[in-house]
Regions:
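Conserved catalytic alpha/beta core of Sir2/sirtuin-type deacylases, generalized to analogous enzyme cores
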Residues: 1, 8-15, 22-25, 34-36, ...
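Generic detector of intrinsically disordered, low-complexity, polar/charged segments
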Residues: 3-4, 130
């Protein structure tokens, strides 16, 4: 199974599936918020926080060595600036309690990586709440010739990730959107709604820019990501932030053509809960958006060859605008209605439930 993803919505499902089937994750590299933003402000690098998060979600923590390494990589520095710098120094010198638990080779790898990235950080860098995993991945990025995919592969190997993680692109870019009211917003963190800034008008368009000055740019897919798409037994546009996590992957040159050429089922799982990015959008408009982005790279492609099915749970949730059965039938897009949503108790989508449905789907459509 291959997922176009980013963010945390699929994290638990990915962790469950990793124990049972082979999964591949194509992850966006255009975010501009949180710990990623602090790094991108002082270094010319792609966003790597979502890649780090997915790699660690796939780690084989049945091993004590890996479990301790994952704990060290998941650690975030304190939010107090002086405490953050002090703890960072403890990490660099290998004396932090989490570092002392590591195997010698893992501790040395972390110490060298953090020391190397420290040399590249400007005085403007904010250490508070920084992700240790992001800092180490940035160090590997520079050590491997400014290449994110080899850095991700190295981290995958060290944590014995059960599955593959691919950066959708090595190119540097940020996300920009235009709202229906005509306003343009540059930067994923400014429109995703995760910090309370919900877009005041529906998102009408999305594209990539080189920087926050707004220069539009075309980027190309990382070759290994295209290869993974061509080999997939099932392609999935999963739950998650629709524009910044799912649609963002489809803006990249080569992805639409690879999806069209892939000889496998292609399934869209719309968000059953509220997604701040989807204000004013219905299920039809979401599918139309996916098709528009994919057809920009593969013009004239039939809808069913890009989005063959939608997976919904009408028993436990409601979808904005309802299920457009006639429209879907007209476009030869199938409806798969399965129970996988927990309507009352968290998590809203239990990873075990969705994983089971996807496994059954892969078998039935394979």
């Amino acid at each position: 199974m291959l997922f176009f993803s980013g963010g945390t919505a699929l994290k638990e499902t990915a962790r469950v599936l990793a124990r049972r089937v082979n999964t591949t994750h194509i992850i966006t590299t255009f975010d501009s918020g949180g710990s990623t933003a602090a790094l991108r402000e002082v270094m010319d690098i792609p966003a790597m926080g979502d890649i780090r998060s997915r790699i660690l979600a796939l780690a084989d923590t049945s091993s004590d060595r890996v479990r301790r390494l994952v704990s060290a990589l998941e650690f975030r520095l304190p939010q107090d600036p002086s405490a953050a710098i002090s703890v960072f120094r403890d990490y660099v010198q290998g004396r932090h309690p989490r570092m002392l638990l590591l195997a010698d080779e893992d501790r040395l790898w972390l110490m060298r990586g953090l020391a190397a990235v420290e040399d590249r950080l400007s005085a403007k860098f904010r250490f508070e709440d920084a992700s240790v995993g992001n800092l180490v991945l940035a160090a590997e990025y520079f050590a491997l010739g400014n290449r994110l995919q080899p850095a991700a592969q190295k981290m995958c190997a060290l944590v014995q990730a059960r599955g593959a993680v691919h950066a959708v692109s090595e190119d540097l870019a940020h996300l920009a959107v235009r709202l229906e009211n005509g306003k343009t917003i540059i930067g994923q963190h400014r429109f995703t709604g995760k910090t309370g800034r919900v877009v005041p008008s529906p998102i009408a368009d999305i594209w990539l820019v080189r920087d926050r000055a707004g220069r539009q740019v075309s980027v190309q897919a990382e070759p290994s990501a295209l290869g993974a798409i061509s080999r997939a037994a099932l392609l999935c546009y999963p739950v998650g932030s629709f524009f910044s996590s799912i649609a963002a992957n489809l803006l990249v040159g080569g992805v639409g053509r690879a999806v069209a050429a892939a000889q496998c089922p292609k399934v869209f799982i719309p968000n059953p809960g509220a997604d701040p990015e989807l204000r004013g959008h219905t299920l039809v408009s979401q599918v139309e958006f996916l098709l528009r982005l994919l057809r920009a790279d593969s013009p004239g492609e039939r809808a069913e060859n890009l989005v063959g099915h939608i997976l919904v749970d009408t028993e436990n949730t409601h979808y904005s605008g309802g299920i457009p059965r006639e429209w879907l039938e007209k476009n030869r897009i199938g409806i798969l209605d399965r129970p996988f949503v927990n309507p009352t108790d968290p998590p809203f989508i239990p990873g075990e439930k969705l994983a089971k449905v996807l496994e059954e789907l892969a078998i039935s459509k394979g």
